């Protein structure tokens, strides 16, 4: 079995990276020629995930525009956190109100993801389903 839904946490202010994040949301910062968000989406695609839910709050219009202008080979739905920042737990809970799957992966786009993680994440999924666990960190 494989997990078909992924959540990407993109709502934060990125304060530790000021002044870089004063006008650009942290997920859209670039390393070389790729944003950290795009790097995250690319690994999720390699995992075979069918649907991505991405939450936004700070400078959300930039994230909306970025996703709209890219042609990612996966269905991406953007969820606005609302009138106030919900923090990590609130953002996850808010996104889970928009889908039915009980099993999902959660990604922080400020982690530098590369293809070497695909095998490790797949092993975690296998372990999760084999042992009928509630969650795996």
Model-derived regions: residue spans:
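Short catalytic helix/loop segments, enriched in acidic residues and glycine
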Residues: 23-38
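Glycine-rich "HGGG/HGxG" loop immediately N-terminal to the catalytic nucleophile
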Residues: 14-16, 131
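Conserved N-terminal catalytic core of the sugar/cofactor nucleotidyltransferase
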Residues: 1-8, 16, 34-108, 114
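Conserved donor-nucleotide/metal-binding helix-loop-beta segment in metal-dependent transferases, i.e.
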Residues: 115-137
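Conserved G/P- and acidic residue-centered "switch" motifs that form tight phosphate/ATP-binding loops
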Residues: 12, 26, 110
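Short acidic/histidine- and often glycine-rich active-site loop of Leloir-type glycosyltransferases
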Residues: 19-20
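Conserved beta-strand scaffold positions in the cores of enzyme catalytic domains, especially
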Residues: 28, 78, 135-137
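Alpha-helix termini
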Residues: 24-27, 46, 102, 123
